[in-house]
Each structure stands twice: as C-alpha cells, then as structure tokens.
Amino acid sequence: LYRGSSGMAGEVGHIRLSKGGSFGYGKEGSFEGFCSGNGIKEMARRMYKEREEEGSLEEQDKGITDFTVKNLASLVKGGSPFARSVFDRSAYYLGRGLALLIDILNPECIVIGSIYERCEALFKEKVEAVIREECFTESVNLCKIEKSELSDNIGDFAALSVAMEVHAGGK
C-alpha cells in the first residue's frame, strides 16, 4: 500500500466532491460526508428540513424523525420517495468518487464495505450509472465494484493491521 510522505495517502474519504454538503471529518462536501453513515444521516436531515420548509414532502414522508441509514433503508422498502432520494444522492456522489479513483488508478476491482455492503441494492444501479457516465469506457469495462465480505468487522481488521505494523517497527 502507498502511504505517502505523511502516512495519509489513500484517505479517499477526504476528497471533496462538492462545495456544499454534509461534513466528513470536518470537510464539507467530502466523500465521507456523502457516503458514510453519519454523513448520510446529516444529509438526510438537511434534505428533510429543506423540503419541509418548501412544503414539498409527500404525505407519507411527513413526520420522519429517525434519519439513520437503517431506518431510511426500511422507509425505501416501504415506498418512501424522500428516503429513496437520500439514497440516490448518496449513490450519485459515491459513483462520482469511485469514478475519480477509477480514472486515476485504473484498478481491476474496488471493494467497498460498511453502508454499501449493507445496502447494496439501494446503491448499485445508480452508482454504476454514474461511473459509466463519468469514466473512460475501457476503464469501466475492466473494473469490478464488489462489496466487502468483512461485514461490521472491517474496523477490527483495520485496527489489527495498524497494531501489527507498529509491532513490526513501522510508523
């Protein structure tokens, strides 16, 4: 893995995808802000407030107070236009971010965990459409987007990897 001069290389969550948007680690409009659990929750709250003020919420979406990804996914399954729009926006930015990585790195495969892993059916079609629109055809045709098989243990494996590196004398 490439670590960079300060050890921060590969922190793609900090890439700014938009001037505005949810915060991820204090950076407005970042990949993390649009695609992480907390980022999606904040984005959903903002979107809900805007639509509530505009009076543009569908009747079935009035009164939503739980903006967690888990609840929003459940609402999508129940036909909520608002919850669907939250996932569509997140998927759009996930697709844009992945398209940048595909164009820069030209990988054979990108493995995504966490929210994508749990909600793949709500993201996949939109993410793939954005990637096809944004990337070189040759790159898209050779890059697979896979969901991680590490489930919620991904953080444990990351911590273990850091501990092993420190123990082995790394930075």
Provide a role label for each language-model segment.
Residues K19-K171:
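ATP-binding/phosphotransfer module of carbohydrate and carboxylate kinases, centering on a glycine-rich
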Residues L1-G7:
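Hydrophobic alpha-helical segments and helix pairs
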Residues G7-G24:
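A short, polar/charged loop-to-alpha-helix boundary motif
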